[in-house]
Regions:
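Alpha-helix capping/termination and helix-coil
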Residues: 10-15, 38, 83, 87, ...
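Bilobed periplasmic-binding protein-like "clamshell/Venus-flytrap" ligand-binding domains
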Residues: 42-45, 87-122
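Bilobed "Venus flytrap"/periplasmic-binding protein-like clamshell domains
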Residues: 1-9
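Extracytoplasmic/periplasmic, Sec-exported soluble proteins
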Residues: 2-3, 22, 26, 45, ...
């Protein structure tokens, strides 16, 4: 895996740090290693389930089943309760920003890359709907002119 090799090479430049890579299939990584905490560092991914930052921020809640690193911070838990109750969008955004900053300051996660995608569409294709979350494209309304 190119990313794993790159990270191993980068980490090996840090004095005193030795990295032993373990390649595994997705099923083992998720259901054995991540679920049971059988790792020191793991490269994993998360994609949004819905169009709101909490799809990522909920991962930092104490006890969240997808919080594989068992990160726990009472401030984050408290802020997330406020996020869930806040109806003012600006205040909610400020609270979520505090959650993200706290988790980053704690090194709860280290973002390495962001998945992207590109697509080409002919000028005569109309009605193609792109979504940033869930199924990337909806073809229901496509017409060819």
């Amino acid at each position: 895996d190119t990313m794993a090799e790159y990270l191993q090479g980068s980490f090996s430049k840090l004095k005193g740090l030795k990295v032993n890579m373990v390649a595994t299939v997705k099923k083992d990584r998720i259901y054995n290693r991540e679920a049971n905490g059988n790792f020191q560092v793991v490269c994993t991914r998360w994609g949004p389930d819905y169009a709101d930052p909490t799809t990522y921020l909920n991962l930092f809640l104490t006890g969240n089943q997808n919080n594989y690193g068992k990160y726990s911070n009472a401030k984050v838990d408290s802020l997330m309760k406020q996020v869930q109750a806040e109806s003012d969008l600006n205040k909610r955004w400020d609270l979520m920003t505090q959650v993200e900053k706290t988790a980053l300051d704690d090194l709860a996660y280290i973002p390495v890359f962001e998945k992207g995608a590109a697509a080409l569409k002919a000028k005569n294709v109309k009605g193609l709907v792109h979504s940033a979350v869930g199924v990337p494209y909806t073809f229901k309304y496509v017409t060819i002119k």
